[in-house]
Structures are given as C-alpha cells and as structure tokens.
C-alpha cells in the first residue's frame, strides 16, 4: 500500500498515527519552554530510578543464592568439591562462606525462576489496565509490593524453605509486572514525540544501571552485611525500593494536566505536542494480519532468543564464577557486573551508529536493524562458545564474557525498537506480546541450567559447557530467523483502509521531510492511499 503526502493544514487527528521519532519536527507553534530542569525531566529521572530498582530486585537473588547455599552440606553431608580440573588457584575458596541451606542445583534453578513466573503473567493484563485506569498507581504500588516482600525473603527462606521462598519471589514478580507497560504508558503521556527516543533510552538504561549496582553491592553485603550477610541484601534494597515507591506516588503525577505545580508553558507544550491520545479512539487491533505477519514473528523469536541467553548469563554467571572459576563472593559480585557495564556503554554507542546509518541514507531501516541486531545476538552467541573452551584461564573467560554481553547491547537498536518500524500505531501491543513470550523463554533458562548441572557436588566444566552451548545456539538460531524474515518497513496492516477518509494531524515541518522506512519521503505526518 503506497504512502502519499498530505496537506500541512489539517489539524484533525482521527487517523491516530503515532510518530515516535521525527527529526527537526515542531509539534507546537510555540517554542519549547526553556527551563533548566523541566517537570518532564524529573518524571523521566524518577522512571529511570524505578527501572533501576526493578532490576536490582530482579538480579540480587542470583548473587545472594551463592552465599545462601551450604555447598559442603549438599548431597546428605557429602562435601562439595569445587571443580578440580584447574588445580590450585591463587585465590583460595573460603569454606566459611558457605550458607545455611542445602539446596541442589535444580532447586536453586526453581528459586531463581520463580520471580519470572509472577512477572510474566502480569505483563499483558497491566498493559490493558494501565490504558484504562492510568499507570501511576499500578507502577507505584507494584514496586511497593515488590520492595515490601523483599523484607520477607530471609523470613521465608528460613521458615518456609524452598517453596516458601519461591512463593515470596513469585509475589515480588507480580509486583514488578506493571513496571515495563506502565513506564511505557507514562512516557507516552509526558514526553513529546520528538523527545521520546532519547528520553526512552534514558529511562530504560536504568535496567543496566540497576544490574551494575546490584551485582557488586550484593556481593559486598553478602560478605560484610548484617544478619548473616545475605539477608542484608534484601533489607537494604527493600528500603531503597520502598522509599522510591513512596516518593514516586507523592511527587509524580499521571499526566501534565493533573500536575499542580508544572509550568503552564511546559504543560501547553506537552499537551499540544501529544496528538490527541486521550480524545480519539484507537482503531481495532488487526489480529489476523499480525498473526500472519512474518516480520512480527521475526521480532518475537529474536526477543525470545535474547531473553533465554541473557537470563542464562544473568542468573547463572555468579554461580559459575564461584563454582568453576573460584572467585570470592566480594570479587564475584564486582566482576559479575562488568559485562552489564559493557552492555550499557555499548548500547549507547551503537545507537548513535544506527541513527547515523539511517540518517546518512546509505542503509535502509531493514538493513540497519538486521546488521545491528546481528552484532547484538551473534556476538554473545560466539562469546559463549569461546568462553566454554577457555578452561581455567579466569581472566580470559571473564574478558570474553564481558565482550559478549557488551555486544548484546546491539539489540536495543535492533529488534527492540523494530516494533516501531513495523507499526507506529500498534507498537505497544506488539511489545506486550513479545515481552511476555520472551520472559516465558527467559524463565526456562535457570531451570534448564539447574538440571543440566546434574551433579551439584561437582559442577564440572563439561556440564557448564552444555549450558553455554545451548544458550549460544538459541542466540544464533533466533538471530538468523530475524535476519531472514525481519523487516524495517511499515506494514500494510498499520493503515486500515478507512484512514483514506480520515486526515491525520499535521505539524509544522521546518526542514527536510522525514524519510520513510520504504525509502520514500513525506512530511512527519503521513497517511495511506
């Protein structure tokens, strides 16, 4: 279905086409208000902290469980022998670091994955509820539930055993479920379209920031903290999350119109630039067309493959570093965060490269997405295979894994934003589907790893090699599927035929027209013919 240019004089917005990132576009006839720290920037900062807190709660168990498990008591009193294929190490393992619980690797896998069961089942429901009732309270109270139940983790582990702990982590996952869909909805209400790209990137960078903070600090608390070390991880982060939740509910408001102290010029600027999101009805979702769309399945499988590989690294890397590479708890937490620091930095760099590739007109949207995504999925796949052959060289293994996870940052300029290329109108719905499915795949990772390491008293390198090989295989296969069937072009089902009689909102274009994903050019607002 070809695109055509439409008149710049229309202001009616029945078409309801959302444009996330148009360069040199002014949504309002007035100039953007000049303030050092506008209210929308404060909202963005609070959402960044919320995302960071969410990932702290999500990842701290992977470090804590290393300190919780009494490795010398596993297998009915048989002493655990660390992987002896490498011989003596220059940093000996301190057996006094053994914890309170004799949990097998399989049980540890269930504990690590229980959080994700709760997280997965609430993705789509909260996406629907947030659209109908607003996002603020779901996000704030969800994080509050997550934080309060963090205080109960030590109590559940000591009093309720494995399944009591799994229940608490499951409830924490339920509380974290609203984070992504509600954050997305808040950004849609507060951030003008021409700012969403950088503001959205700033908010979601909180995920990597939270992981970077969680890993080393959890390691330090496990070794030097109060109440036996590992419980302090959940007490400290529980306090931080509770404080953030209360502050968020008090100081942040649902939208600019409901904010009592926002500058009137900023409120007008935001409301004028948000193209009628609250006054028009979205067209029906074209379920049949989406189900038949190969580019949609390309994103779906790429997302699922990424989550499986990423969760394998996130949940199992601290255990591998202690049991095989023999890092101490303090070193474990610090060094485990290095790959995510690399991912954070590389994702920032590669996003600039991706923007240049598209703006230079040397690469199409499709070519850019596939090339950058290949780096993001083939890179960690190859690194996992290489790391499985590095043997006892701890420095080389850590370096390879750091590079591999760092390259994984390419996915943020690959399939992660490809929803917007295919369908600006239904991108949120597509994200809820792929994110839910991807997290289902991700929760299988720690369970699979726990069963593959069949002898928990001797986690041999060969067993870990299988874990790495499977994750690498999933990365590469799903990345290849994306390269074959993926697309950066806007899909025909994003523009129903009745849009022909419904002119879209137009805005003042001050410079060159935007370039569409199919290679044609048009003003920022477009309609189909």
From Swiss-Prot:
This is Putative inorganic phosphate cotransporter. PROSITE patterns: MFS (PS50850). It is a multi-pass membrane protein. GO terms for molecular function: phosphate transmembrane transporter activity; symporter activity; transmembrane transporter activity. GO terms for biological process: phosphate ion transmembrane transport; sodium ion transport. InterPro entries: MFS, MFS_dom, MFS_Na/Anion_cotransporter, MFS_trans_sf, Pi_cotranspt. CDD domains: MFS_SLC17.
